[in-house]
Amino acid sequence: MGVGIQVRDLNAYYGKAHVLKHVDMKMAPNHVTALIGPSGCGKSTFVRCLNRMHETIPEAYAEGEVLVGDKDIYARGTAAVDVRRRVGMVFQKPNPFPTMSIYDNVASGLKLNGIRKKAVLDEAVQRSLEASALWNEVKDHLHKKSGASLSGGQQQRLCIARALAVQPDVLLMDEPASALDPISTSKIEELMFTLKENYTVVVVTHNMQQAARVAEYTGFFLMGSVIEFDTTQKIFTTPSDKRTEDYITGRFG
């Protein structure tokens, strides 16, 4: 089952540039939370801080608390690799390993964690592909086709399966449908509804209609700060801050 995420006074930097400023947010378990805002507002940096991907960039670092369940992922002695096992990530552009089969793409994280038993891998691959609504489309050529041979929408669902294979608590999705056609986008959105039954889902999106369709909660970012965080219905119908209203109604962004 998914776990809640509580962010307290999170600040992120690229060298001397202060790009996330005193962010507080509480994301409910087994719900979809959408993050919206104009380009460069900090929402993608924020989501990367939730599994410590931000620190993989030279001179980038973060300060503050991020509790996944009851564990602060920035606590001294916490290994980033353990954090990323609990908090999976799916990126804007599908990135399957091009030389690997569909099967090996999904099993790659498990193998990195030392799992070698075929029966265990087989079960995990099928479970993950079923959870990402891809199993029926690829089950007959798991070992014959590479991940790169799939369509764009299938590749993105393969990347979701790869993230799910290690059984995370949280799934982060950074504009997962922005590079896809409308039909593939619809499948990704449908998938979010089923994924939240077992995972906490956080999605970055530029698509306001998508946020309204898929998320129970929405946070609006602007210039590195969270301007407003509330239920999606309230954000889109009666926002408390005029800047939120201006963004949602297209006055800027």
UniProtKB/Swiss-Prot annotation:
Q: Provide the GO MF annotations for this entry.
A: ATP binding; ATP hydrolysis activity; ATPase-coupled phosphate ion transmembrane transporter activity
Gene Ontology cellular component? Answer: plasma membrane
Provide the ABC transporter domain boundaries. 5-248
Give the Enzyme Commission number: 7.3.2.1
* Entry's localization field: Cell inner membrane
Q: Which InterPro entries match?
A: AAA+_ATPase (IPR003593), ABC_transporter-like_ATP-bd (IPR003439), ABC_transporter-like_CS (IPR017871), P-loop_NTPase (IPR027417), PstB-like (IPR005670)
Q: Spell out the reaction equation it catalyses.
A: phosphate(out) + ATP + H2O = ADP + 2 phosphate(in) + H(+)
Single GO biological process annotation from the record: phosphate ion transmembrane transport
How does this chain sit within the bilayer? Peripheral membrane protein
Q: What class of enzyme is it?
A: translocase
Top-level taxon of origin: Bacteria
Keywords for this entry?
ATP-binding, Cell inner membrane, Cell membrane, Membrane, Nucleotide-binding, Phosphate transport, Translocase, Transport
Per the annotation, which location comes first and is thus the protein's main one?
membrane
Where ATP is bound, by residue? 37-44
Entry's family note: Belongs to the ABC transporter superfamily. Phosphate importer (TC 3.A.1.7) family.
NCBIfam families in the record: 3a0107s01c2
Q: How does it assemble?
A: The complex is composed of two ATP-binding proteins (PstB), two transmembrane proteins (PstC and PstA) and a solute-binding protein (PstS).
What job does the chain carry out? Part of the ABC transporter complex PstSACB involved in phosphate import. Responsible for energy coupling to the transport system.
- Annotated protein name in UniProt: Phosphate import ATP-binding protein PstB
